[in-house]
């Protein structure tokens, strides 16, 4: 029995180290975007849907947006004209290099293997806003 709990303890330590490193990489990617692009804020929601047509409801990242305005939070109903959904990054606004940096972060955030870390680190049913000042977390209603 002791062997099992030693193994479980080792697993939890490794998981914790992985989570810390993964969040550090995400925060560093965000920092680089702020330093090397015109992006001033990054926003996303993350939650487990309440209902999914009978399929299993799984935690996911949703609504990733970037803004060239300095915002402390995003209002999804009142997006500024300088706020862009990541699926529609305008090459007239963003350079190929900027789009590449943003896309690299998006790939990390949308990787299903990192979902558990994001849920543990930031929560479920939340909206995340990242600015140069840091990351803020608000409750998010997604009915």
Where are these regions (language model features)?
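Acidic interaction surfaces
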Residues: 1-143
């Amino acid at each position: 029995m002791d062997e099992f709990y030693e193994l479980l303890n080792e697993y939890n330590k490794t998981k914790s180290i992985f989570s810390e490193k993964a969040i550090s990489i995400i925060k560093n990617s965000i920092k680089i975007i702020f330093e090397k692009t015109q992006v001033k804020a990054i926003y996303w929601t993350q939650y487990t849907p309440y209902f999914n047509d009978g399929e299993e409801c799984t935690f996911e990242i949703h609504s990733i947006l970037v803004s060239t305005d300095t915002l402390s939070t995003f209002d999804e109903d009142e997006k500024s004209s300088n706020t862009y959904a990541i699926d529609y990054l305008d090459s007239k606004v963003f350079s190929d290099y900027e789009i590449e940096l943003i896309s690299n972060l998006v790939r990390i955030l949308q990787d299903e293997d990192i979902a558990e870390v994001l849920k543990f680190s930031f929560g479920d049913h939340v909206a995340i806003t990242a600015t140069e000042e840091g990351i803020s977390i608000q409750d998010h209603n997604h009915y």
